[in-house]
């Protein structure tokens, strides 16, 4: 099992799919990485040599922000908004949708499970 960016990627999957197990790398970035390294997209992880895995690891470390660094940056961005006290920060603080979605009927994922209110039934 190859270990890239602190993640054990599955060995019997195609390289493009396996790279997507790393937080911060989707389909587009996975294709860019293997194109930059020069490995065919159809290759499977267990077919890679150690030098090819090392090239992929170096490319990701050099050019992309993934896993812990990416999670930390997102958390710091949200914290910055909350500290500023701007509208988006207030919405984050109250666990409500941030981007203008309606909250009268929907937004259950963000607001949590519905709570019963006495006298609300008609």
From Swiss-Prot:
Gene3D superfamilies: 1.10.8.50, 30s ribosomal protein s13, domain 2. GO terms for biological process: translation. It holds the Pfam family Ribosomal_S13. GO terms for cellular component: cytosol; small ribosomal subunit. Keywords: Ribonucleoprotein, Ribosomal protein, RNA-binding, rRNA-binding, tRNA-binding. The keyword Nucleus does not apply. It comes from the Bacteria. GO terms for molecular function: rRNA binding; structural constituent of ribosome; tRNA binding. InterPro entries: Rbsml_uS13_C, Ribosomal_uS13, Ribosomal_uS13-like_H2TH, Ribosomal_uS13_bac-type, Ribosomal_uS13_CS. Located at the top of the head of the 30S subunit, it contacts several helices of the 16S rRNA. In the 70S ribosome it contacts the 23S rRNA (bridge B1a) and protein L5 of the 50S subunit (bridge B1b), connecting the 2 subunits; these bridges are implicated in subunit movement. Contacts the tRNAs in the A and P-sites. The gene is rpsM. Residues 97-122 are annotated as: Disordered. This is Small ribosomal subunit protein uS13. The keyword Magnesium does not apply. Belongs to the universal ribosomal protein uS13 family. Part of the 30S ribosomal subunit. Forms a loose heterodimer with protein S19. Forms two bridges to the 50S subunit in the 70S ribosome.
């Amino acid at each position: 099992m190859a270990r890239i960016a602190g993640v054990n990627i599955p060995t019997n999957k195609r390289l493009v799919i396996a790279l997507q197990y790393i937080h911060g790398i989707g389909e587009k970035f996975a294709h860019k990485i293997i194109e930059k390294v020069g490995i065919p997209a159809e290759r499977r992880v267990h077919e890679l040599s150690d030098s090819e895995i090392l090239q992929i690891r170096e490319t990701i470390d050099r050019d992309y922000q993934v896993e812990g660094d990416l999670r930390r940056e997102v958390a710091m961005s949200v914290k910055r908004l909350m500290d500023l006290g701007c509208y988006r920060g207030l919405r984050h603080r109250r666990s409500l949708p941030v981007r203008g979605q309606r909250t009268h009927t929907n937004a259950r994922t963000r607001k949590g499970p519905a709570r019963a209110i006495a006298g609300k039934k008609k």
